[in-house]
């Protein structure tokens, strides 16, 4: 059986999607499938390390200033060539698609022409996320129709969690869906006995865009420094909000305590997380985030690092109901509340034995490999039907 994965983002480009799709591809390979990945050429200077036994085909794509495939001109620079790459390649038994909606729509057209089923990794409802960056009714209306049309043609949606599936149903998208949850790649993220730092260090790892609202921790850090003068806040990742956050740090006079870094490979990030006082994660208080989950918490927990989350959505329930006393805390999207939680973590950092126990618990509960097995089980059932 031949499986083709269509995704604008894949290793060595650093993102949650890259790691997730790699585990899916490897699981398809282990089940005896012939796996091909159609993706984009990576950013300049990236070192390619493709998974064994999987063919990865890359094509040029338009990237933004941060070398990221973001925005609809960039998406179309991937989607239009993708249509021809799919049309004129050897026929597949299944397409696996990573959004944006335009990519899913392209795959629906080709899938119909080639009579090939497709499934979608549905981690977000893009139409609502777009409300953060445009108020144009025309653009939002077109996007909703394109997204609904693409998702409605799939044989299966692998949704991030049940609240997102429920949101699809409200929007009239009735495609069969399996909430698969989230996890971390436990081969990369682990705890190796690091002691908590002194002075305290807080890590934000991942994208910081408008709907993440990660600048809340810059404001909180201004208060934290009153109690812990040597504390640091470090951002690893990229996003549209970076310049605004840097300006905010300068305006508060704390620019030397707030540092920004490019994305780094998971294994390197794991070492940093394992040695941090806590990780911080946030989602802005907007309607679409009522069902969005801050997936970066899973990597943190796998590395034995507790989480401080600020914002709405399922992450709050996850942390408050986690079956582990050291998983972390959830607070409102408020700088004062975030600062209080950060000060508490700095005053009583989690010791190594408790960090080791947290990492062990997390790796047993939230493994990307286990999720990949479920995805492939469902996908192969579709092929065989």
Question: For each of these PLM feature ranges, what is it?
Answer:
Residues 41, 163, 182-183:
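Carbohydrate-associated surface elements
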Residues 155, 273-290, 305:
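Acidic donor-binding loop of glycosyltransferase active sites
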Residues 83-87, 105, 109-113, 122, ...:
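Membrane-proximal helix-turn-helix segments that form the acceptor-binding/catalytic region
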Residues 169, 183-199, 213, 349:
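Acidic anion/phosphate-binding donor-loop and adjacent secondary structure
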Residues 158, 195-221, 234:
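Conserved donor-binding/catalytic core segment of Leloir-type glycosyltransferases
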Residues 1-55, 224, 385:
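N-terminal subdomain of nucleotide-sugar transferases
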Residues 243-270:
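Nucleotide-activated donor-binding/catalytic signature segment of Leloir-type glycosyltransferases, i.e.
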């Amino acid at each position: 059986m031949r499986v083709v994965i269509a995704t604008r983002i894949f290793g060595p480009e650093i993102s949650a999607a890259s790691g997730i799709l790699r585990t899916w591809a490897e699981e398809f390979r282990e089940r005896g499938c012939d796996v091909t990945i159609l993706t984009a050429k990576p950013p300049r200077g990236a070192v390619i390390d493709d998974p064994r036994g999987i063919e990865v085909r890359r094509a040029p794509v338009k990237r933004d200033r941060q070398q990221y495939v973001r925005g609809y001109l960039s998406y179309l620079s991937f989607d239009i060539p993708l249509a021809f790459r799919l049309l004129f390649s050897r026929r597949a038994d299944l397409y696996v698609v990573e959004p944006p909606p335009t990519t899913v729509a392209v795959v629906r057209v080709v899938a119909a022409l080639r009579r090939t089923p497709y499934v979608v990794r549905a981690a977000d409802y893009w139409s609502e996320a777009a409300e953060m960056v445009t108020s144009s009714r025309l653009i939002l209306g077109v996007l909703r129709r394109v997204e609904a049309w693409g998702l409605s043609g799939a044989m299966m949606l692998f949704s991030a969690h049940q609240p997102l599936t429920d949101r699809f149903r409200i929007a009239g998208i009735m495609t069969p869906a399996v909430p698969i949850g989230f996890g971390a790649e436990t081969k990369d993220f682990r705890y190796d006995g690091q002691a908590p730092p002194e002075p305290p260090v807080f890590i934000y790892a991942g994208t910081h865009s408008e709907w993440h609202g990660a600048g809340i921790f810059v404001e909180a850090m201004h208060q934290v420094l009153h109690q812990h003068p040597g504390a640091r806040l470090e951002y690893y990742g990229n996003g549209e909000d970076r310049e605004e956050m840097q300006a905010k740090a300068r305006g508060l006079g704390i620019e030397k305590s707030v540092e920004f870094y490019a994305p780094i490979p998971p294994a390197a990030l794991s070492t940093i997380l394992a040695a941090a006082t806590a990780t911080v994660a946030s989602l802005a208080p907007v309607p679409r985030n009522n069902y969005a989950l801050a997936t970066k918490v899973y990597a943190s927990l796998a590395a034995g690092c507790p989480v401080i989350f600020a914002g709405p959505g399922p992450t709050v329930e996850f942390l408050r109901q986690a079956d582990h006393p050291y998983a972390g805390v959830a607070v409102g999207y408020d700088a004062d509340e975030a600062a209080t939680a950060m000060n508490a973590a700095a005053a009583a950092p989690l010791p190594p034995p408790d960090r080791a126990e947290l990492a062990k618990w997390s790796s047993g509960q939230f493994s990307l490999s286990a999720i990949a097995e479920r995805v492939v089980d469902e996908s192969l059932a579709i092929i065989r039907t």
